[in-house]
């Protein structure tokens, strides 16, 4: 499905008022729904990657390595936009890092690339399914249940059968 480019006029009075309102609300009480939608307000290109690509492609069916006390959200951005993203997250007072380091609460872990490959799943820009599967296979021990879900949902013919072992 073709996507239209979105242009955000940051000088628009309505945009300024809404941004001020949103900043105040998010700074005090960022929830997961808001966090996953927040990058859309940047007007910059990005894609959910890593654990979040798996989370999105499994439609929330598989989530790992996070808790209510520490919830990283993984995105990839264009290298040329790094300073703009830093300003964006700082402006919204949202925690972020360019390496995977534990922080409290909801925060973004950002990787950079010269170009971004993306597909859309549930209207969210995400690492393409094939690349997500390749990534998950590198960490098969952690993602075997997710690989089985993806195989079943998208008929990938991976032949993955996850089985829990009890000692």
Predicted segments with their positions:
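Generic structural signal for residues positioned in beta-strands
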Residues: 5, 72-74, 132
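Hydrophobic alpha-helical interaction segments
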Residues: 79, 83-167
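Short secondary-structure transition/capping segments
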Residues: 15, 44-54, 148-156
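Alpha-helix boundary/capping detector
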Residues: 14-17, 32, 159-162
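Short, cationic-aromatic polyanion-contact patches
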Residues: 2-24
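Short gly/ser-rich loop at a beta-strand->alpha-helix junction or flexible surface loop bordering the NTP-binding
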Residues: 23-105
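Residue-identity detector for threonine
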Residues: 19, 49, 58, 112-115, ...
């Amino acid at each position: 499905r073709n996507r239209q480019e979105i242009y955000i006029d940051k000088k628009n009075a309505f945009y300024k008022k809404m941004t001020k309102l949103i900043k105040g609300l998010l700074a005090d009480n960022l929830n997961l729904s808001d966090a996953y939608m927040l990058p859309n307000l940047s007007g910059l290109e990005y894609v959910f990657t890593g654990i979040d690509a798996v989370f999105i492609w499994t439609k929330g069916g598989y989530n790992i390595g996070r808790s209510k006390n520490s919830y990283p959200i993984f995105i990839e951005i264009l290298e040329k936009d790094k300073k703009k993203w830093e300003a964006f997250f700082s402006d919204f007072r949202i925690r972020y890092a360019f390496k995977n380091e534990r922080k409290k609460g909801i925060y973004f872990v950002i990787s950079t690339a010269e170009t971004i490959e993306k597909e859309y799943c549930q209207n969210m820009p995400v690492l393409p399914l094939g690349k997500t599967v390749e990534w998950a296979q590198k960490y098969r021990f952690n993602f075997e249940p997710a690989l089985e879900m993806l195989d079943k949902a998208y008929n990938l013919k991976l032949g993955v059968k996850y089985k829990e072992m009890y000692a």
